[in-house]
Amino acid sequence: MFPITTPSTIPIKWTNNSLCKSFVSGEEYNKQIAVQRTLEAVDGILQKSNGFNIDKLILCIGNDVMHIDTPSGGKTTKGTVQDVDGMFFEHFHIAKRLYINIIETLVSFYPDLHVVYNSSNHDYLTGFCLADTIATYFRNSKNITFDISLQHRKYYTYYNNLIGSTHGDGAKWDLLPLLMADECKEWSETKYRYMFTHHVHHKIGNKDLIGCSIESFRSPSPAD
């Protein structure tokens, strides 16, 4: 979690309710720790943003937030078994409360918030259901907008900046600038272009490709 290079826009992401035991990995990680680290990260971003003339926030949600997509067996959408902490239904309620908490915190500092949902391969169904639930919860908030469509790549224009996000399990990195130029008419109207991915769940160094900078978000898990 970090502010992107345009000083007036901040994307934020919480992902991966996966399980990590200290006797296996050397560090404990569970759903409570994931929530705590996420809230600490949001607080840290808000502190770092203090003093900047920020008039717009972008919050990225989705991206394997549920980690699994079945109520039993701990399996992803395609059936891959995962290590999880707690029940599937617990995950949904925890993620819902966390998203609501984050959004309410952000708009208390900066009143203009755009929430972007990126569908993902671990929780293609329940991730969307969660995003739709959050959008419904804030449906009467005039200063919060949502994009919860199932498009694989989302784009947002902020002055002369074109900001894209995608989960990252589809098109290869070197193709993303070409897809952005083909799919988004604002390509020719903007000077600075960014694409953020999430699939690898850890930070990858910035890559400056033709006409676009690409970066991957990390998750709160110990390995990241």
PLM region descriptions:
Residues T15-N17, N63-M66, S120-H122, G168-D169, ...:
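Active-site metal-binding loops of divalent metal-dependent hydrolases
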Residues V107, I134-T145, L150, Y158-D224:
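Conserved beta-sheet core of the metallophosphoesterase superfamily
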Residues I4-W14, N30-I144:
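Core catalytic region of metal-dependent phosphoesterases/phosphodiesterases
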Residues V24-E27, S72-G74, P177:
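Short coil/turn segments at secondary-structure boundaries
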Residues N17-V24:
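Short acidic, Gly/Ser-rich segments with clustered Asp/Glu that frequently serve as metal-coordination loops
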